[in-house]
């Protein structure tokens, strides 16, 4: 694999299931408005009143689906991860100098039928020092919110990324648990203050795939490994120090939720997790972040599922473990280890319990892919985007649980 590749495929294969590299190579997709001003007091910019087309999204009164707050209509997520562009760059790498690219990509995602875009914000780009947020990055985030409102797309804002280890400040990496959590709280406090008034925010995802160390193992690195140059999995502590894992997870979640709620008491909060219940099924334990001991302040469940060939039923059985009385979103999915048809079967089979599905888009349209001499990964991507576009009216037109 080329070192510059930053795709989710590498992350999933190497960090979770350690499949042979030769298998990975056959599946990996080759990667191919004026700024808002900061307030005079130096605090983050807020986004002004929303476009009328976007309603605020909340869990339903039964706690088991999403609804549009004003109309009460059910809302089903059909979205994409916009985690990098076609050349593997993170959004902060180009959203200043190439804003037109972001605008075009949002139009393209909308044309595919997506209603939610998951963006991945990096800690180092939004935090200058242990006590100071980056006003420039926050202004650009406010600009992104305006674009989302104008385009009619909701944002799943995933934060605290350290995907490029070389960009992580040494002072942040050297911190102990308490100080690191304080910086993470500053990140979310600043982001929430910027986003609080915009209905374009679907949710805040506290961190992509947080993990904890073993009960009797003290770790030395906050990041869980180097996968083709990117780090997608991150530890929230280096040492449990005799504490139950769920207690540490709850303390971390509650601290960051409190930081958000200091500015924003409306938008939903979640954590996108590795589905260990799937990887170890049927010997599955209760999820750490979505247990009754931990998830009190999380509004819905987010899990990342990549069904294997011939194992769709197993994936569905494992997914059911995460049906814990909250809305459920499959926040990452792609035909990485199965066919497009099998992933479609997984989607259909999950509609009885799931309230949304989020795949991937990397800035290359179906038409652009069709114009190329595609290799296998490119063909998989093209076929999947075609499926995604065709499936959108069915998903968005009929709802899910109430119609199954």
Predicted regions and their residues:
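Short, conserved loop/helix-junction motifs that constitute active-site signature segments
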Residues: 294, 320-324
């Amino acid at each position: 694999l080329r070192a510059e590749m930053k795709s989710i495929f590498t992350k999933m294969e190497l960090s979770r299931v350690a499949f042979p590299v030769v298998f990975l190579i056959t599946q990996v997709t080759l990667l191919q408005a004026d700024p808002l001003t900061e307030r005079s007091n130096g605090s983050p910019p807020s986004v002004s009143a929303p476009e009328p087309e976007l309603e605020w999204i909340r869990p339903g009164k039964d706690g088991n689906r999403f609804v549009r707050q004003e109309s009460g209509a059910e809302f089903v997520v059909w979205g994409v991860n916009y985690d990098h562009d076609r050349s593997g760059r993170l959004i902060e790498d180009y959203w200043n100098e190439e804003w037109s690219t972001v605008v075009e990509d949002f139009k393209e995602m909308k044309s595919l039928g997506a209603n939610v875009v998951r963006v991945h914000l990096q800690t180092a780009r939004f935090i200058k020092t242990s006590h100071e947020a980056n006003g420039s990055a926050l202004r650009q985030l406010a600009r992104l919110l305006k674009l989302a409102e104008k385009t009619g797309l909701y944002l799943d804002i995933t934060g605290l990324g350290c995907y490029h280890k070389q960009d992580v400040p040494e002072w942040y990496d050297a911190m102990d648990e308490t100080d690191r959590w304080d910086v993470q709280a500053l990140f979310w406090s600043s982001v929430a203050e910027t986003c609080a008034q915009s209905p374009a925010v679907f949710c805040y995802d506290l961190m992509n795939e947080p993990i904890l160390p073993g009960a009797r193992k003290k770790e030395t690195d906050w990041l869980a490994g180097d996968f083709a140059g990117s780090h997608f999995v991150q530890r929230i502590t280096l040492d449990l120090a005799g504490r139950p894992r769920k207690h540490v997870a709850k303390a971390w979640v509650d601290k960051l939720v409190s930081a958000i709620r200091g500015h924003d008491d409306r938008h939903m909060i979640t954590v996108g997790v590795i589905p260990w219940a799937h990887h170890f099924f049927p010997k599955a334990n209760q999820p750490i972040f979505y247990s009754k001991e931990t998830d009190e302040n999380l509004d819905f469940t987010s899990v990342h599922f990549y069904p294997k060939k011939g194992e769709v039923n197993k994936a569905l059985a494992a997914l059911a473990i995460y049906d814990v009385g909250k809305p459920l979103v499959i926040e990452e999915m792609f035909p990485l280890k199965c066919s497009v048809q099998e992933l479609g079967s997984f989607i259909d089979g999950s509609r009885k319990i799931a309230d949304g599905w989020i795949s991937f888009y990397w800035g290359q349209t179906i038409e652009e892919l069709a114009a190329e001499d595609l290799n296998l990964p490119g063909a998989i991507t093209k076929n999947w985007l075609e499926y995604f576009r065709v499936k959108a009216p069915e998903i968005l037109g009929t709802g899910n649980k109430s119609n199954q």
